[in-house]
Structures are given as structure tokens and as C-alpha cells.
Regions:
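A non-catalytic alpha/beta surface segment that caps or lines the substrate-entry region
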Residues: 1-50
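Glycine/charged-rich beta-loop-alpha catalytic/anionic-binding loops adjacent to active sites
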Residues: 57-69
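His/Asp/Glu-rich mid-to-C-terminal helical/loop segments that flank catalytic regions of hydrolases
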Residues: 232-307
Length: 307
């Protein structure tokens, strides 16, 4: 269903990814608007006004559409984009009041491109600051317009495996109580959605960064969801218990003095090792991941959160 010729065409090096999304959605009657912010071009789906009810909160759903230079970007992040494009087409003429604001963001991978030739990992560091993300500028606009009470759901790299992974995020103890409560509420909501979509088989794990970091940095509650194969998720959880410092390596690329970096790199899930390489290709994807995502998005569409 998802992994057809359109998907392959989207992966072609010469494809203008922004135009592809606009044209694909337009061909299915879906209206869009391009939002230029800080040199990036984000794409917003313009749902009919009848899609919204003032009685419930807006659910902002995001996936970055840019890819790392030289990588096909099949999982990172064409997988999420294609899932959301299909979802947008289904929602657009559904007639239901879903309260979804859907945005395809640009510039997430720019934070991963270093001046030297070595591809950076998907994690934060001095070389890869959260402020370099395209979504950081978008979150800044949200903050300026006082759009701070939305739920923000980010989908990143959902094309391999059947285990939904909720990115483990940390809220500073000094954070405002309103923000802390908002974050824990959205975390609880997405956990319920993931649990009901996959017979309870979901996990919360440390994950390399995604667009939710830019929103969190602005005090806007946001969660990120990715996917892993069962064997990779189990092995990763086991290694996190055995070697607690693995978490800091995944999130911040920090290596303890008495540990070899190569030792830690071996414990990174195989799916993540494909990021930013030629191995992140069409053949690496699994059809069942997209079936799982369809269930998750359907449950998210019907979720109603009273204002």
C-alpha cells in the first residue's frame, strides 16, 4: 500500500521533496500552505474549518521532510512523511472534527551536518545544537503567537519494525509547573494511543533527537515517536540496563573515560546505524511498520482533548 512507485519516486536523488509533497497532496484534493521561517520551508496542511471544534485542543502533528545529504532517507524520514501524507488525504474529506494541525518541517537534518566530512549522529552536542533545527524556528513562532497549549506529536523514522518507541524526554525540575503538567499529560495520552494500537507492545527509550526538542526548548509540550524491530528493541533495552552510561552516549554522544567509543557504538540499534548512510534505503523498510502507523494515526485522529 505505502511502499509503491510513489514512495520510490520520492526517494530519487533528483526529487524536489517540497514540491513532491505539495503536488502529491494537491492531486488528492488536499490544500496546503508553505511557511517560510528562518530560511526553511515548512508545509502546513490546510484542513477545512469544519475539521475543528473549539471544545477540544488542537493536536499538532509533525514530521520533517528533509533528508541528510547523500542518504536516500527512506526511514529518516520519508517513512513518517508518507504515513502523514496518506493520513492527510484520508482526513481531508472524512467530515470528522479531528482538530489536527499537520506540518511537514524542513531543516531537521541541518543540525546534523558538520563542516567536516564525517556525518554527525542524530544527537545533541556543541556541534549539533537544538537551535539549529528547522523546528526550533517554528516553535519560536508558536511561542510568539502564544500557541503554547497544543499537544505536539512528532513522528520520526517509523519505517522499520513493529515496536512503537516513545522517546524518553527529561523535564527539568525547575520547569514551570504548567509546562510539567502539560508534558506529563501528553506523554500519558500518547502512551495510551500506542498501547491500544499495538496490543500493549510499546516502550519508552532514550532516542537520538527529533523535532520535539525545539518545542520543549520553548516550553511547549511535545513528544516524539519512532519504531524499532522487536529484536533490536529488546537488545537495546537489555544493554541500557547492563550499561547505564549508554543512555548518555545515545542522547549526548558522551563517552566515559574508561570506555571505548567503539564499544558503545556496537550497542546502537541496527536501524539507527543506517541513519545518514546509503543503507537507509527502500529495501531496509518493512511493510508492517506502515500498517502499525496507520492504526496509531487513526487513534490519534479520534482523540478528543477537552480545552
Amino acid at each position: 500500500m505505502y511502499l509503491g512507485e510513489d514512495f520510490k519516486k520520492f526517494l530519487e536523488p533528483q526529487t524536489n521533496r517540497r514540491d513532491f509533497i505539495l503536488n502529491w497532496l494537491s492531486a488528492r484534493g488536499v490544500k496546503t500552505a508553505v511557511m517560510p521561517i528562518d530560511g526553511h520551508e515548512h508545509i502546513c496542511v490546510v484542513f477545512p474549518k469544519e475539521s475543528y471544534s473549539p471544545l477540544f485542543k488542537i493536536k499538532t502533528v509533525i514530521a520533517h521532510y528533509d533528508i541528510f545529504p547523500g542518504s536516500p532517507g527512506a526511514n529518516d524520514n520519508t517513512s513518517s512523511v508518507f504515513c502523514l501524507m496518506n493520513w492527510a488525504a484520508r482526513l481531508y474529506n472524512s467530515g470528522i472534527r479531528h482538530n489536527v494541525r499537520l506540518i511537514f518541517t524542513d531543516g531537521e537534518e541541518i543540525a546534523s551536518v558538520r563542516k567536516d566530512s564525517e556525518p554527525a549522529q542524530k544527537s545533541f552536542s556543541a556541534e549539533n545544537p537544538v537551535s539549529a533545527q528547522g523546528a526550533f524556528g517554528l516553535a519560536n513562532v508558536f511561542k510568539r503567537l502564544n500557541i503554547v497549549d497544543d499537544d505536539v506529536y512528532v513522528f520520526d523514522c517509523v519505517g522499520r519494525g513493529t515496536v512503537p518507541v516513545l522517546s524518553k524526554s527529561f523535564v527539568p525540575l525547575k520547569a514551570a509547573s504548567k509546562f510539567r503538567n502539560s508534558f506529563f499529560s501528553i506523554e500519558s495520552r500518547i502512551a495510551r494511543i500506542l498501547r491500544s494500537s499495538c496490543d500493549g507492545k510499546f516502550v519508552s527509550l532514550p532516542v537520538p533527537y527529533s523535532d520535539n526538542a525545539g518545542f520543549l526548548a520553548h516550553g511547549i509540550a511535545a513528544v516524539a515517536v519512532t519504531m524499532l524491530p522487536v529484536d533490536e528493541a529488546n537488545e537495546y533495552m537489555f544493554n541500557l540496563v547492563r550499561f547505564p552510561y549508554l543512555e548518555d552516549f545515545v542522547l549526548n554522544r558522551k563517552v566515559p573515560q574508561d570506555v571505548e567509543k567503539s564499544f558503545l557504538e556496537k550497542m546502537i540499534p541496527a536501524s539507527w546505524k543506517k541513519f545518514h548512510t546509503r543503507q537507509d534505503n527502500f529495501d531496509s523498510l518493512t511493510e508492517e511498520s506502515f500498517v502499525m502507523m496507520e492504526k496509531i494515526l487513526q487513534n490519534l485522529a479520534v482523540l478528543k482533548i477537552p480545552c
